[in-house]
């Protein structure tokens, strides 16, 4: 077949990924580096790219300092407790002290935030404010698009590898990828790169299979590229063994946060028991975190897991009791509560609203099943996998700081969002904030390091050939069998995915293994892989 055409783009700063952190990075890069050429590349379209592409019903990271709600110190205390001690206090504080200004910026750009009659933000939890958030991502993307200019946005381009300097393997030099809708390989040469691509869904076999395939809680398009790009060039990572297992509504994967915090619902097992009450003594095994308020997410999930393991399921979110109590017998209030219940999912998890509708569930009358989902790997939600990055100069201890905030151990490579490890609970607003912080550092790095990077032509050609190799293999052997998915010379991407999921599910602590694993089991999984 021969290689497709190769096109090279040169820039000062390359932003990889157009999610919340990517849009924040692109916008902020042009604010501080007005004279710099900033390029953003995304495998989709930035208006709907990233984990929030479908929308959100709440901002889950907001201090509320203007109202005296919380301080960054409060946030650090909460995050460290929720992660049972495993978190970088400097990185968490850095997000906490800046995130409010990011939320106010999003509101200025047009994000509708729920407000009280006096103009104060509504509040549904200590750190959460409700929004009409179906449009969150387009609202965030528009300023980024305008800031860098349409000529500097490369969409439908999938980045496959990072490139290092020809004379220094510890210096970033750009990236290479391919057009997903055109016959072209793209090479980006950059003085600095900001890694803002996604965490990893679909590594473990989802609970939704066969007819439900493609339905996951975290974005189905989060393929772990933040990690798959940084690790091969030697970037130091942290907390990569951390798996986040969320409690979610069954089958539709609807989040439970709004139901716990705004509707004040609770979960019961089939016997009508509340596991947070009946298993309170279990928490004492995990002090000092067992007595932390609120109870850390891993421990709450562990309490539910024990109920399920002992055969006390199904587990039900008592939406009916919560909605009836909020309405207080007033039909008009019930109409409002019902509207808010459905909007919660229509704003961000339409599949859950469809699940209710298809099963004739009226949440004010019928409780809904909840389950522990399959594990996910990410750095922006309640997971903390990602790169080991330099902290802020005024907060980080000497061993955590090497010149530029959010820079990885590869010079010139910065990270934000899912790409940063040991800094969880950022969610959408915090990821956007972290992208902005990384961009500010990247601009300073470019201005202070003027020596131009050099691409290794041999490296580029080798990677271009490896990118194109699957197409060559398919074209060469497609005639060997009459069914393209059954062939002795290759496997399809879908076949590779389901085989990986089977191995991870059964050997690496997935749902079928009750989230358990051990050394010999993991070693066996490597043999199978």
Whereabouts are the PLM-identified features?
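N-terminal Rossmann-like FAD-binding beta1-loop-alpha1 element of flavoenzymes
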Residues: 13-39
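Short hydrophobic core segments
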Residues: 14-16, 189-198
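Glycine-rich FAD pyrophosphate-binding loop
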Residues: 32-53
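Glycine-rich active-site loop/strand segments that organize a redox cofactor
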Residues: 60-95
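Mobile, glycine/GP-rich and aromatic-enriched active-site lid/loop segments adjacent to catalytic centers
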Residues: 100, 107-173, 241-427, 506-526
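Glycine-rich loop(s) and the adjacent beta-strand/alpha-helix scaffold that form part
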Residues: 195-254, 428-441
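Long, amphipathic alpha-helical stalk/connector segments used for oligomerization, subunit docking
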Residues: 448-526
């Amino acid at each position: 077949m021969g290689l497709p055409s190769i096109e090279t783009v040169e820039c000062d700063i390359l932003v990889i990924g157009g999610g919340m952190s990517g849009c924040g990075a692109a916008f902020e890069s042009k604010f501080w580096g007005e004279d710099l050429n900033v390029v953003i590349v995304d495998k989709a379209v930035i208006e709907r790219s990233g984990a929030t592409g479908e929308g959100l019903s709440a901002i889950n990271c907001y201090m509320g300092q203007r109202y005296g709600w919380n301080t960054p110190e409060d946030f650090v205390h909460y995050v460290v407790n929720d992660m049972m001690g495993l978190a970088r206090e400097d990185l968490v504080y850095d997000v906490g002290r800046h995130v409010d200004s990011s939320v106010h910026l999003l509101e200025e750009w047009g994000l509708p935030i729920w407000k009280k009659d006096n103009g104060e933000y509504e509040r549904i939890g200590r750190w959460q404010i409700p929004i009409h958030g179906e449009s969150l991502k387009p609202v965030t993307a528009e300023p980024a698009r305008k800031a860098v200019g349409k000529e500097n946005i490369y969409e439908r381009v999938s980045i496959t590898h990072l490139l290092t300097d020809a004379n220094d393997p510890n210096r970033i030099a750009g990236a290479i990828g391919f057009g997903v809708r055109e016959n072209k390989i793209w090479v980006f040469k950059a003085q600095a790169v900001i890694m803002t691509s996604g965490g990893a869904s679909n590594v473990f076999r989802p609970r939704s299979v066969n007819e439900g395939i493609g339905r996951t809680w975290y974005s189905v398009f989060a393929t772990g590229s933040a990690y798959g790009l940084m690790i091969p060039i030697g970037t130091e990572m942290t907390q990569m063994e951390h798996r986040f297992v969320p409690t979610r509504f069954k089958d539709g994967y609807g989040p439970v946060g709004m139901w716990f915090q705004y509707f004040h619902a609770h979960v019961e097992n089939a016997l009508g028991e509340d596991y947070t009450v009946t298993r309170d003594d279990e928490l004492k095994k995990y002090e000092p975190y067992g007595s932390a308020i609120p109870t850390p997410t891993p421990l709450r999930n562990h309490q539910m897991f024990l109920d399920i393991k002992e055969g006390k399921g199904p587990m039900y979110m008592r939406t009916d009791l919560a909605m009836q109590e909020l309405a207080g017998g007033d039909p008009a209030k019930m109409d409002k509560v019902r509207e808010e219940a459905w909007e919660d999912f229509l704003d961000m998890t339409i599949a859950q609203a469809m699940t209710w509708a298809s099963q004739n569930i009226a949440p004010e009358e019928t409780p809904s099943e909840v389950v522990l989902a399959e594990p996910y790997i990410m750095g922006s939600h309640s997971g903390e996998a990602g790169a080991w990055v330099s902290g802020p100069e005024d907060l980080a201890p000497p061993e955590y700081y090497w010149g530029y905030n959010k820079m990885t151990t590869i010079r010139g490579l910065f990270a934000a969002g899912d790409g940063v490890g040991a800094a969880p609970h950022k969610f959408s607003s915090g990821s956007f904030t972290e992208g902005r912080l990384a961009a500010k550092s990247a601009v300073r790095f470019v201005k202070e390091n003027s020596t131009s990077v050099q691409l290794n032509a041999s490296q580029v050609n080798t990677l271009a050939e490896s990118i194109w190799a699957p197409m060559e293999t398919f074209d060469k052997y497609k005639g060997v069998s009459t069914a393209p998915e059954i062939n002795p010379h290759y496997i399809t991407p879908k076949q590779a995915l389901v085989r990986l999921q089977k191995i991870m599910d059964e050997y690496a602590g997935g749902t079928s293994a009750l989230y358990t694993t051990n050394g010999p089991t993991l070693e066996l999984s490597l043999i199978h892989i």
